């Protein structure tokens, strides 16, 4: 007898129709087979008696019974189900995705085209990947000082417009890509008020992007079909890396250079890119003997870097764009730092602050105050004033009374410290 779930309901077999009595007389296996044919969605097991929320049968008089559920092989149950069109479509797609691919045939390498030239396989998407860090840094432009310098010197050199555009573009590319490398080597955090590229793209990708643009710039120069330009390019890139190498060496070994060593380093590193642009212009200039502007541009390179060193330690604008006194955090022997250390070599406070490469603002303020006490900022201002006046006179001599020094004088005015 089937146990009842409710004591109020009584079971009377005589009240059931013959078909129902026949169903009750069937074995469980026969019942399963019949129910599977008539109803494909039927449960694989019989429904258990109704229970309370505690799991106890609702009938107080019900006697314990054996579990109604019985194990059913999964294959038997699933074979009874017929999937809906939507389910069939979903599973069909999944099956295609999961189907194993045939193993590749190694013999294909005997005849496949393996010439992956740039024209054949290099896409804009790939180019964007490699240029990513460079494109990021140029999206936050600086003051474009080098383009202004090229324009000022072109009054004397008179370079054809087409050549001048290429030279301006090349100098800009070299400058921006060198910043990518500088920021990695100096462990900088900010560039022009934004996070440095290597903190976004990673060190390796940033270095690769910077080096890549060096050679893209070289390809640009080839468009002018002037072998002299390639020689100038390679010479000044060598100088740039020589200067950078010495600057890094002094920081890494805590070696304070002399002012003469410092000026030589700046002439190679900072002056190198300035000189590169002017030399390229002279090689493309109209006329047989262009004005020799190299001595003046060398002097402007020194002025630019010494001023940059001064502003790094004293300017609020520099603090916003690069961080407060970033040169101290980098452990850099800048022009005011060199003067301060050599003014009193027995005082080791400043050189030990450089050794710490600290980001502590209180310590950096103390270092600045110490340099003030040694007269290093006043000395730097006086040196800048002397160099700027010397550059003005040199520009007038180059001009020879033609009245074409306005652009140079304007640049020198901007570099003067009031």
Swiss-Prot record:
Binds 2 Mg(2+) ions per subunit. The record marks 214 as: Important for determining product chain length. Residues 51-73 are annotated as: Disordered. It holds the Pfam family polyprenyl_synt. Its cofactor is Mg(2+). Isopentenyl diphosphate binds at residues 143, 146, 175, 192. Residues 51-64 have a biased composition (Polar residues). It catalyses: isopentenyl diphosphate + dimethylallyl diphosphate = (2E)-geranyl diphosphate + diphosphate; isopentenyl diphosphate + (2E)-geranyl diphosphate = (2E,6E)-farnesyl diphosphate + diphosphate; isopentenyl diphosphate + (2E,6E)-farnesyl diphosphate = (2E,6E,10E)-geranylgeranyl diphosphate + diphosphate. Keywords: Cytoplasm, Isoprene biosynthesis, Magnesium, Metal-binding, Transferase. Mg(2+) 1 binds at residues 182, 186. Its EC number is 2.5.1.-, 2.5.1.1, 2.5.1.29, 2.5.1.10. It is an enzyme of class 2 (transferase). GO terms for cellular component: cytoplasm. Mg(2+) 2 binds at residues 182, 186. GO terms for biological process: alcohol biosynthetic process; farnesyl diphosphate biosynthetic process; geranyl diphosphate biosynthetic process; geranylgeranyl diphosphate biosynthetic process; mycotoxin biosynthetic process. Pathway: Isoprenoid biosynthesis; farnesyl diphosphate biosynthesis; farnesyl diphosphate from geranyl diphosphate and isopentenyl diphosphate: step 1/1; Isoprenoid biosynthesis; geranyl diphosphate biosynthesis; geranyl diphosphate from dimethylallyl diphosphate and isopentenyl diphosphate: step 1/1; Isoprenoid biosynthesis; geranylgeranyl diphosphate biosynthesis; geranylgeranyl diphosphate from farnesyl diphosphate and isopentenyl diphosphate: step 1/1. Its main location: cytoplasm. Dimethylallyl diphosphate binds at residues 191, 269-270, 305, 322, 332. One of its GO terms (molecular function) is geranylgeranyl diphosphate synthase activity. It is found in: Cytoplasm. Catalyzes the trans-addition of the three molecules of IPP onto DMAPP to form geranylgeranyl pyrophosphate. Belongs to the FPP/GGPP synthase family. PANTHER family: GERANYLGERANYL PYROPHOSPHATE SYNTHASE (PTHR12001:SF44). This is Geranylgeranyl pyrophosphate synthase. It comes from Fusarium fujikuroi (Bakanae and foot rot disease fungus).
């Amino acid at each position: 007898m089937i146990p009842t779930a409710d004591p109020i309901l009584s079971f009377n077999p005589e009240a059931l129709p013959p078909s129902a009595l026949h169903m009750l007389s069937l074995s469980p296996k026969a019942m399963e087979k019949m129910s599977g044919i008539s109803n494909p969605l039927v449960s694989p097991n019989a429904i258990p008696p109704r229970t309370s929320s505690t799991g106890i049968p609702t009938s107080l008089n019900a006697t314990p019974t054996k579990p109604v559920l019985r194990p059913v092989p999964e294959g038997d149950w699933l074979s009874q189900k017929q999937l809906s069109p939507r389910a069939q479509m979903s599973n069909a797609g999944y099956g295609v995705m999961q189907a194993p691919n045939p193993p590749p045939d190694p013999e294909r390498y005997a005849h496949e085209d393996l010439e992956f030239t740039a024209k054949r396989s290099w896409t804009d998407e790939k180019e964007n990947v490699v240029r990513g860090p460079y494109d990021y840094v140029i999206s936050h432009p600086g003051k474009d000082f080098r383009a202004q310098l090229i324009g000022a010197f072109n009054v004397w050199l008179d370079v054809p417009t087409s050549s001048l555009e290429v030279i301006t573009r090349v100098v800009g590319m070299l400058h921006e890509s060198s910043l990518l490398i500088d920021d990695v080597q100096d462990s900088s955090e900010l560039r022009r008020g934004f996070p440095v590229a290597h903190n976004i793209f990673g060190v390796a990708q940033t270095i690769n992007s910077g080096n890549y643009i060096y050679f893209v710039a070289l390809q640009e120069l080839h468009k002018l079909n002037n072998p002299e330009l390639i020689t100038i390019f390679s010479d000044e890139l060598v100088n740039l890396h020589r200067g950078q190498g010495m600057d890094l060496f002094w920081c890494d070994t805590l070696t304070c250079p002399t002012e003469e060593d410092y000026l030589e380093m700046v002439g190679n590193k900072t002056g190198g890119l300035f000189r590169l642009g002017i030399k390229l212009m002279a090689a493309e200039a109209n006329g047989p003997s262009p004005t020799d502007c190299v001595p003046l541009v060398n002097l402007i390179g020194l002025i630019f870097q010494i001023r940059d060193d001064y502003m790094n330690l004293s300017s609020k604008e520099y603090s916003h764009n690069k961080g407060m006194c970033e040169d101290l955090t980098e452990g850099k022997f800048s022009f005011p730092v060199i003067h301060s250390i050599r003014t009193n070599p027995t005082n080791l406070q400043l050189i030990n602050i450089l050794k710490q490469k600290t980001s502590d603002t209180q310590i950096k303020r103390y270092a600045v105050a110490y340099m003030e006490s040694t007269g290093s900022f006043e000395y730097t201002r006086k040196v800048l004033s002397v160099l700027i006046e010397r550059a003005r006179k040199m520009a007038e001599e180059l001009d020879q009374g033609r009245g074409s020094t306005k652009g140079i004088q304007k640049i020198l005015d901007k570099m003067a410290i009031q």
